[in-house]
Amino acid sequence: MMCEVMPTINEDTPMSQRGSQSSGSDSDSHFEQLMVNMLDERDRLLDTLRETQESLSLAQQRLQDVIYDRDSLQRQLNSALPQDIESLTGGLTGSKGADPPEFAALTKELNACREQLLEKEEEISELKAERNNTRLLLEHLECLVSRHERSLRMTVVKRQAQSPSGVSSEVEVLKALKSLFEHHKALDEKVRERLRVSLERVSALEEELAAANQEIVALREQNVHIQRKMVSSEGSTESEHLEGMEAGQKVHEKRLSNGSIDSTDDTSQIVELQELLEKQNYEMAQMKERLTALSSRVGEVEQEAETARKDLIKTEEMNTKYQRDIREAMAQKEDMEERITTLEKRYLSAQRESTSIHDMNDKLENELANKEAILRQMEEKNRQLQERLELAEQKLQQTMRKAETLPEVEAELAQRIAALTKAEERHGNIEERMRHLEGQLEEKNQELQRARQREKMNEEHNKRLSDTVDRLLTESNERLQLHLKERMAALEEKNVLIQESENFRKNLEESLHDKVSLAEEIEKLRSELDQMKMRTGSLIEPTISRTHIDTSTELRYSVGSLVDSQSDYRTTKVIRRPRRGRMGVRRDEPKVKSLGDHEWNRTQQIGVLGSHPFESDTEMSDIDDDDRETIFSSMDLLSPSGHSDAQTLAMMLQEQLDAINKEIRLIQEEKESTELRAEEIENRVASVSLEGLNLARVHPGTSITASVTASSLASSSPPSGHSTPKLTPRSPAREMDRMGVMTLPSDLRKHRRKIAVVEEDGREDKATIKCETSPPPTPRAVRMTHTLPSSYHNDARSSLSASLEPDSLGLGSANSSQDSLHKAPKKKGIKSSIGRLFGKKEKARLGQLRGFMETEAAAQESLGLGKLGTQAEKDRRLKKKHELLEEARRKGLPFAQWDGPTVVAWLELWLGMPAWYVAACRANVKSGAIMSALSDTEIQREIGISNPLHRLKLRLAIQEMVSLTSPSAPPTSRTPSGNVWVTHEEMENLTAPAKTKESEEGSWAQCPVFLQTLAYGDMNHEWIGNEWLPSLGLPQYRSYFMECLVDARMLDHLTKKDLRVHLKMVDSFHRTSLQYGIMCLKRLNYDRKELERRREASQHEIKDVLVWSNDRVIRWIQAIGLREYANNILESGVHGSLIALDENFDYSSLALLLQIPTQNTQARQILEREYNNLLALGTERRLDESDDKNFRRGSTWRRQFPPREVHGISMMPGSSETLPAGFRLTTTSGQSRKMTTDVASSRLQRLDNSTVRTYSC
């Protein structure tokens, strides 16, 4: 076998050989190619190792066969050679010995041994070649690993740092290499042990060869002695010579195959024998040489094994190195292990349940053993009773013979006959009890099988859940990576904007200084004007005084007229203050300017300390706090003391994904709002710097207003979210003073007017989206909807009226996260990578901004933004899901146009699907069109629903929703209002005859007729298992119905196979009982409230037996005087629908189920009389004229259930267009039904002969 050398792996590209630094993606691709090559090489090595092991096992088997043949030949040789020698000596001396052996046969056997030895040598050489090949492969693999050790270690660390969610393929490769080396080490030890055994056998063979050589030497000596005797016996008698000749002739006849023996020459025979002995000696010597060669080769094999062991030691050293790397990688694997531990804890809990089930099984087996012993005792008693019966019969025959003469014996015989009848009754009771015990035994066995099936299903669900969790985690990791890149890009852009805003601020400060100097010049000019007016005459004095009053008034109202009017800032009046001098105005200007400088310095500190120039720092801090709470809450959910069910885990994963999506959406919106804010700042700076100077030259009072406006702009423009003003009494007036007289460009004013109109809109469900997509609504930006008026009184009024807008528009300054704070308590996600990245910076910023955080906390309290508890969070999620369904109802969307969250809410709220199915649908189904297009096999493959009844449930629900939400549904299948959803008012119209029709619009999720159980889950699988089945007297099937999620919609679609296989309803009577229960629901149009109302009405009266439950039937049996037999129909399937609708179910069937003995005629007569009375008073069944014992159904039953409904499809007008083939619906038609109650008749009158499709969920 040739030694195949593995091809080398191209580890480095030409770029890397030249030493150039390649990009991260190229190195990753090369490394992945390298790992793929190593994995392929590992597979090849495993294949060669497997083949080598097989060949080694074959060689060992062959070696054992050769050893066995050699031992047998050796024994034959040892046993044959002495006899041959003795026979030869006897023949030569003329004695009457045995015939000489067949040396030709020995030579043939010797040749066969030689050929077998050659074959074994070839096999040994092949094994050596294979072992050499394996050693070369291992050396090649070791070279590869040592060559790429550094790159492997770096990439393992890099991969683990990037994706902490799972274990990389490199770790798996290292583990595989370690297992391969350990396997080769164990194999080498096995080979060494076998070599030691073979060497021991070779030494034993050498000893045997030495003994054989000694025997050959002794034979030679005997031959020499025989030759001497032959020389001395030449003068023997002729008769002895003739006998020798005959012996020689015999030898010649036997050795004729050699062709070298002369029958007349004894010496030639001896020579021949000597030659044969020499040949055999030569062959034995060759055998010995070959054995020595074999021993030398075995030594070589041992040396090779030693080298292989050294190689294995080297590989073990490499493995230790890799194990160190693996330990480093295992530190990153702890997160996954924690989640695995939670799953393991759940598995342990399931295992504990299985152990408890096993214990219960053992108890049941012990009880069964006891019952079997009781049964044996009862059988023995039965035999004794039978023997006594036979003896009694014999005695009866004897007494019958004596009956004519002994009349007294007849009385005694009658007594004995009565005793025998009693014994027979007891025997019948015992047989019935035995049958009952056998039935219980079968039920226990079935329960055991069901428990095992449930355990298997739990394992499958756990596996699916772990797969879904892994897939969701990988997807969230990818989204977080993209999120991080986009956030970093936004950071760079915002840093550029901050620098530009710094430049704008410097320009503003310069313009402010210029305006101060201009104000000083204006005051000088005014003082000169005053002097000139004093010098002028008395004729011009009134006009000048008026102008002075006007200018001073303008000056007052432009700067500080509203600063101290905090008490009446909510009114539309402007209260004038006493006049102040020019020094008062100058005192106010530094205040405003210092306020702007203070704000700007604080903003600089925030930007430098945080290096995180977001506009929504408060949002990030709030999200950080919320995320911190959510992390601990999610860890509580994962802990064993918290909620460990699958639904909570799926809900938590969905919250994490929603939080990630929300953060991505917020980043995009912040980017857009940042761009809009930059344009706004540029426009403001340009308008203030250009218009302010012109206004200063023309109107002196207006220049001061412009300065105040610029200072207010400077105080409100920092991008940090912590610049929210404190809610003090002076803040509204000061805010109006700063904001009320500002001029904006015309296009920006129009944009602000649009924002104000949008904010005043009453659609609360879209408010947050509009606020986030539009620029942030600061108080100044929202209120500034007017240009500079001619009268400052009107300006003040407009500012005051604008200040009375809702608090949501006036509480923040430049805080774009104010709207996102509205959404903060709605959904709390996990702490994202952005929160981790900037958490420390925000903490450093919190130390300096504690005062601003207090005001923000006050604003949050005023807006109701407190942290919600766990129950409130669940209620909010539930309300959000109801709102999704309500929105779909309000828009009238077909099912194909529903989005993914609406479909998931529909599955969870209305359908009641398990949490793992909901999680799988959330991951795989993104719209109603995808859900409605899924076939049965796709539902099983994509969503993982393996139970056929679960698939039936989902398929029927999808078909129903598609047909109900279809815009092409005919009017006959709709409600009187023409809407496919029945409103609350229409429901009242259907149930209350005195009420008139109300509005068509209503809440779809509150009270629809056909979907009332859909919205509230009234007739879902919980109701079927917990209430309906016990009311039928079939509570033993509750667990199966609950496992299969059987709801009212599925009842009419269950086949016999489903009942027998999936629901374990093997008893035909129980299936019949279930069928009549379904018929009862059909007659009530699947109306649970009507069913409960009629049951409540017939609780204490013998009427309306159709709706009687099993408990009501038991109470009726107790009331008629059969209390001792009443409990026998528990779990028997006897209920009112069976009595009222099954014409084959008569009093004898009920007596059999009640286990009333046939001898108890009195109880049976009571039952017959009361049963007939029950049928006459509470059902539509009547006694037939021909036979009093048989009953028949009334004509109403035959009309209400036509023959074609027996096959499972009830056709009705208007339903064939919207419903698929085989989809069964019930009809409620005024012409085809006669309802007994007034409510039902009034409902039919208001339906106007239209059909209402009713199904539950």
Curated annotation (Swiss-Prot):
Protein name per Swiss-Prot or TrEMBL: Liprin-alpha-2
Record-linked InterPro entries: Liprin, Liprin-alpha_SAM_rpt_1, Liprin-alpha_SAM_rpt_2, Liprin-alpha_SAM_rpt_3, SAM, SAM/pointed_sf
PROSITE patterns reported in the protein's UniProt record: SAM_DOMAIN
Annotated function: Alters PTPRF cellular localization and induces PTPRF clustering. May regulate the disassembly of focal adhesions. May localize receptor-like tyrosine phosphatases type 2A at specific sites on the plasma membrane, possibly regulating their interaction with the extracellular environment and their association with substrates. In neuronal cells, is a scaffolding protein in the dendritic spines which acts as immobile postsynaptic post able to recruit KIF1A-driven dense core vesicles to dendritic spines.
Compartments reported by the entry: Cytoplasm; Cell surface; Cell projection, Dendritic spine
GO molecular function, one term: protein-containing complex binding
Phosphothreonine modified-residue sites: 237
One Pfam family cited in the UniProt record for this chain: SAM_2
Cited CDD domains: SAM_liprin-alpha1_2_3_4_repeat1 (cd09562), SAM_liprin-alpha1_2_3_4_repeat2 (cd09565), SAM_liprin-alpha1_2_3_4_repeat3 (cd09568)
PANTHER family per record: LAR INTERACTING PROTEIN LIP -RELATED PROTEIN, LIPRIN-ALPHA-2
Segments of skewed composition (Polar residues): 787-802
Recorded family membership: Belongs to the liprin family. Liprin-alpha subfamily.
Subunit details: Forms homodimers and heterodimers with liprins-alpha and liprins-beta. Interacts with the second PTPase domain of PTPRD, PTPRF and PTPRS. Interacts with KIF1A; the interaction decreases in presence of calcium.
Segments for region (Disordered): 1-29, 439-463, 709-738, 759-834
Domain comment in the entry: The N-terminal coiled coil regions mediate homodimerization preferentially and heterodimerization type alpha/alpha. The C-terminal, non-coiled coil regions mediate heterodimerization type alpha/beta and interaction with PTPRD, PTPRF and PTPRS.
Annotated Low complexity bias: 16-26, 709-725
Residues where Phosphoserine is found: 236, 239, 687, 689, 817, 820
UniProt main location, coarse: cytoplasm
Domain SAM, residue spans: 898-964, 1020-1084, 1108-1177
Keywords: Cell projection, Coiled coil, Cytoplasm, Phosphoprotein, Repeat, Synapse
GO cellular component: axon; cell surface; dendritic spine; glutamatergic synapse; presynaptic cytosol; synapse
Coiled-coil region: 29-154, 185-235, 264-541, 643-695, 1081-1107
